[in-house]
């Protein structure tokens, strides 16, 4: 009996003394990593992200009561909170160790409120944060705890309320007039507009003809001819000249006539040196862009994998460790210790002359949030080779990209020896250039995916005044290209440049507009769907400020000011909501007066004989029987454009790819394979007889080698 009492006492004593510190993080993955760094008197548990939010079924705050938000426990988080309350009872000190950003600060604040930590009398509650999940970083944060930063909490709360206002008030209008289940978002609507605007630019673009003229010149002592490109007319004094384009075959013929029998003389030879600077470390935006281009990762996949690398993975010989610093950042700053370690690593493994001299990082701009670092490896000595066996393929590829970029950022520039030559040919001038890598510097470790390959040609021993022998003149016809469709990478870059969104919002925004089928992705390119076009038209007409880029960018700036405590969060809400409320009320009245009737077609239902109507589906328009639900017959919608097929004479119809990209094909498909990305015209090219396509108020020959163009008839011009 005494033994039993002693056993119970030991258990009670163990329960009291061994878990008197509680660390709360967001994810179970972090729990696993951090537990290995701390002693047995630390309990580490996870909240699983947010535990409270605005209720889904209502706005979540009352404008009549000064917009005070009403938070409720998220469904499924009751058990999580119950478990955390038990752990809190056992602990003397509680550390809120959520992510080091506004979202993380807000999660800690909600945990404080949900667990009533601010009401505890005999326990100490702290906020700790760390930029990397390593033993040193976690232990250092425990030595320097702080209070919650209510300004960061308010900034996140304001963003959440603004997003709720837009979604809750505008989405029902889209349900009523377009399709149930659609959503309008404050940032996603702007991203959609950017894609729609780019599509409009592409559709309105009219290609301009131009010609290149290459002179292939033999140089004494060189096996390969030198490729020199036409530059323009030379000045009387010599090679300076004026650059001019060749706009047509007629202009080309005049130049070719001038060049008959002339000598080609090197008028100016310049030798020099070009410095290629090392890249700066990754931010969230640049990591997403480079991972898209180099690894073909979506923004969502990049963030998911980076999250795993940050939270911790098992590395042979090192245990569980966070391999990279925090992944949501727009800073290029690097901690002094990490900078020194990287430079030392470079000197040891590559040589003294490969290490960067002086400041290697770009200065942060006014948009930079909080005191974050750039994305970098937590330990530069953990090279990709050392961790390869421990990581799944995609984790390894992203880690390798981050490691190489950061290492390169601490290295010396690459150096090229350059030679440029200006060649006079009668009254015309040609130019050529070449470069040779003389010192690879950072390029021994890292070359960005979009770096242009250096010219491979070698310029021989050419001196000013030397005559070169013409081997061949090679003209080539080209046409200017429209702006490129956005990719995920280029959209993120454009959003960052315009100040739309922040590191934490880029990937979710793009994921949402694709998931909602407003945008489709095909071969990396983003195309707006018919559904996206309809939503964008409504947003631009009824809520112009919501989709205005400068308005949205200014709102991000105001949120930054809330975060630094210079603007009160309610000031933003009080200014925003009344204007939104008025716009919604006006839009409701306007849309109520617009009755959207089903478009009746001449197509007869082959099951019941009714005239079929046009409906909208996930992939655009289709034909449906109006007798639904008695008759459920549907057919593809073939929208005829009144133009005969250039191949077989049947009707050309407007179609969309599965990804939502518009094109024109023959109604007789698959028997006829005619297809065009541009809208065909009834006009024939007077020059070559091919069919013509519409581009704005112009008609262009579909035969690219022809290049003929003309104005549309006046009655067809917009």
Language model regions located:
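Metal- or metallocofactor-binding catalytic centers and their adjacent structured scaffolds
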Residues: 237-280
